[in-house]
Amino acid sequence: MSNPNQAAKTGQTNDAQNPASACPFKQPLIGIIPVRYAFDVYDDQGQALHPLPKADRQWKGQFSIKQRSYTLRQLRDGWLYVYDETAKTLHEYEVVGCKLTKIDWSDDEANKPTHERGSKGESKSCLLYPAQHTLSIGYAHQRWTWRVCEHMRSNTSSRHAVMRKVSLKQFESNGTHPHAHFAQYLEDYVADIGTPAEQDIFKDTCTPSLPVEKSEEAVKGTEFKFVADKAVVSSSDYLQDLPEQNCGLFVALNDPLADVSDLFVTFTTQVAKRTKAIGDETQQHKMQMAELTRTLGRIRLEEKEIPDFVKQDPIRILELERAITEYCATAKLAEIESHHLASEGHSPSGNYALMQQQAEQKLAELKTLYRFEPTSAQMRKWRKKDNSFIDEVRWADLDNFLVEHYTELKGLDEQIKQHYAQFMSAFNQLGLDPLLFGMDNQDEVQQAYLLALTSQFLVVVTQVNHDEKSLEILKKDLSFDSPKNLMALASTGFSLQANQAINNHIQGFSTAFLSTSNPSDMVAFATAIANWDTFTGDERIQEKAWFKRWIEPAQSSFGALQKAVANQAKESWQAVMELLFPYQNQPKGGTPSLLANLRLLLVESLVREEAVLQHNPKYAAELKQFETKLNAILQEMNDALELKPGNVSPKNHQIATAQSAQRKLGQLLSSELPMMLTLKNQAAMNTFQQSVNEKLSALSKNVKTSSASVSQKLGGLGGLLFALNLWNTMTVLENIRYKVAQYPSWNPFKNPALGEAIYATGNTIVVAGAISAGRAWVTIAEQGLLDRTLKNALNTTKVLGTKDALKTFAKSIALVATVGMIASALETWESWGKFNDSSKTDLERFGYLLKAGATGAQGIIFYIQFFTLLGSGIGGPSIAAISAGWMLAGFAVIGIVYLIGVILTNVFKRSELEIWLSKSTWGKESAHWPVGKELTELEHLLHRPSLRLSQVTQRKAAQWMDSGSLQWQLELTLPDYLKGQTIGLQITRLPAQPAYYQPQREAVTPILINEQQGKWSIEDNQPVYRITLGGSEKDTVGVCVALPLRWGKELSLKFYASGTRAGELDLQSAEANDIATRNLVVGKG
């Protein structure tokens, strides 16, 4: 800031525009104060804070940006260049604060590094040049290299494009000049001169007005000061060195990098606001779960179905969805009501139709408030939607959260789009030649600067584009084929000539014969690469003829880029290449895409020494040897895993043989897979090597004996009941080994799987014992022994058949009562526990209460029956009391109550998805799961694969007495998102034990199936995998499946199942380390 003496020195005694005063420009030298155009800032009402006079049309910045206007600001600290068109000399000044320090050049500056050029001379607050001269003045944030200085000095068109031409003679003559004005008005026109320093109105720009002492800490340690403050000063600080009080003018220069950076800072400020509004990871997860819950529990409209006046307001869309959901639910109830009224002879539209009236009222609200009326097609589609989730969610809390969230975000997305469009418009207008804003792409430091700058731009630009349309536009802007801006040229050293050279060289490669569909074509392709003379040999690429033809003209820019990447810009280069890759890579198959992607490899080869590619001249021979070894190992695995009809079952050593072959395969793929193109740097090459280290594990399973139905042998209702209970027992015991393994306790009261198995088996025994007791009861009743005690009847009866009937009756009742008490106690305990489970619906819990009461009462009857039997055996109650009529009546009533309970638990049972929703973030019974667990639980439900066993013919009948043989076929159906991905799969088959007796029976060993032999198909847009397993249909099949998560590919869902019957297998979830699988590509084969 100026002191009183400086202010007095610059006091205005002459008015340059007053014809009666002495003209201050009648001096040999005129003072010139350079300032710059900068985008203005705006208040909350959108009004510019420092607009230039609208009537004065001479002020015009470099870029034409909608909704943005220019003001004037001080120059950033940097460099100023003045070419005296009259004297034909170029001068260099360093800009620091409000001081311009002249750099004096000697005669040998051309060979010096840029930072060592010249020596500091006199410092003043303005430029001083003869009043009759014409000047070209230009600003540069980065110091011009000598190449740029020579170019600007010799190239008139570039000089006029980059520098501001100022005719001092013209200004002296008429007092006007484009982009210039009298120095005395400096404070009136320049926004950050004379403004109170505490009002940092430019904080969201690349040059905030913070005091110097604060900003020095903020930028300390940064290599390139992309954001650096410029302290506010008074006009006297600039006017103090004028040759005569008002003998001076200020001239506005262009600073295109500052303009672009200002727009970028404003743009990122809006992005930061949105990020803050979205919140932390927890808040974002709540938002994600809210949207998911809306999708599950409410009717969501497609974008084209939403009324136009509602589309732009997410809160109105939320209200519309809620209204439509309520209307559809009411309309469904009205339809049920209508059928009910019609069945009773009432008119469905009369006073009885209350739900119909409510539905009509809600439809009228939809038409009035939202101008929306559902079509019949929409109603049919929505009726299919499961609305059972509605009662599981805290909708009021969810709606309040969304309304609050949308309110915070309101307008931010539109502002981000607006500021993004402004930034991209300016950046595209910046052009493709760094020379036009004073940057030298042949200089290492300036290459590093441009890489650092564009990497920052790319980070944000590539993150804010999400919809398909904006991504397509961005891909065109960043195209390698036809670049629109410098970000697209970053990979070729910001040189359009280098970009065109790469493209021309690639296009010169003949594509007529190339195909990559089979190994022989790959050999032809490898030969073509070698003949192309691009990647071959041990010579450096720069020595190739094609390089001298195409790249040598742009070799200096590549050399500078290579040095920058090797030194200070390594991280920036990596960031730029990673960010550009999705937009410059060609993901589609075919030769054109392959050739297009070779450009990126070629660029890496030119820039990074460790990325230099070399062609493998022995590729064809190595590929042939690899195929021979691969086929031999696969045959070895096939022989060990796949039995041919008639062969003896494999012994233990065959599993070891398969494991050995698998290890050989892994070693072959990891160490001997031939590479057509390799990196010379071995450390870098290792990142491309993939090793296969799959662990083989046989899934063992205890032998299970199948039982045939005995209903025909037992006959009647009792036989049928026994068969049904036997089937239920087999169903429960099917996967008991795996179910029990989920619980650490062997206490049946603590282990539901074990308890279920015991009481299911017990009920079967009870029914079988009751059948036996019933037959004996008939014989006892015929002999008239029911009124006697069991002891008396046994002692007095002489008939052998009657005595056997009494003994059978006693043993059967003892078995029935004992097992019945145990089974009833276990089932009562389980039902009572489920009754206390708050995650179940009220009616489902009531059903379990009925079951608990019924089984508890049943247990009491068994208890009484058991002790009545004991009493009758010692001379107490009669035989009739052991199986009294009230007991039979009790069992009948209990059966009805139990049946009602079963119906309630099945009809009103919550689905797994309903239970998950009730325990999720917005559920009424939220379990407050961690983020990962909540999403994983959902993936288990939504993307659970389907496994099915079916019987197929293994060997056809050879003659009339030969019925042939069957084998299992496994069918695996996967979610559609897994197409082309790698899953884990392991299939084992446990042969059935021989039915005939063997004195020394060998242990049955599971057989590992080669999953690569299966076939894929697409059915209903889902991948379906089928494989025949060999053996017989009596074998037990075990399957382990590992699927990558949709939201996190590094994690996986794991399932296992086993079965011995045709039909769908029961999949069980497994912990990550519980099962072993082998890799299988979905859809390949």
UniProtKB/Swiss-Prot annotation:
Gene from which this protein is expressed: vasX
Predominant localisation class: secreted
Disruption phenotype: Deletion of vasX gene together with deletion of vgrG3 fail to kill Escherichia coli.
UniProt xrefs under InterPro entries: Toxin_VasX (IPR048126), VasX_N (IPR046864)
Stated role: Toxin secreted by the type VI (T6SS) secretion system that acts on prokaryotic target cells. Acts in conjunction with VasW, an accessory protein to VasX, to compromise the inner membrane of prokaryotic target cells.
Protein keywords: Host membrane, Membrane, Secreted, Transmembrane, Transmembrane helix, Virulence
Intracellular or extracellular location(s): Secreted; Host membrane
Chain residue ranges for the region called Disordered: 1-20
Keyword Lyase recorded: no
Topology term for the membrane: Multi-pass membrane protein
Keyword Magnesium in annotation: no
Protein name: Toxin VasX
Annotated TM spans: 753-773, 813-833, 860-880, 884-904
One cellular component term from this protein's GO annotations in UniProt: host cell membrane
Lineage of producing organism: Bacteria, Pseudomonadati, Pseudomonadota, Gammaproteobacteria, Vibrionales
Disulfides per UniProt: none
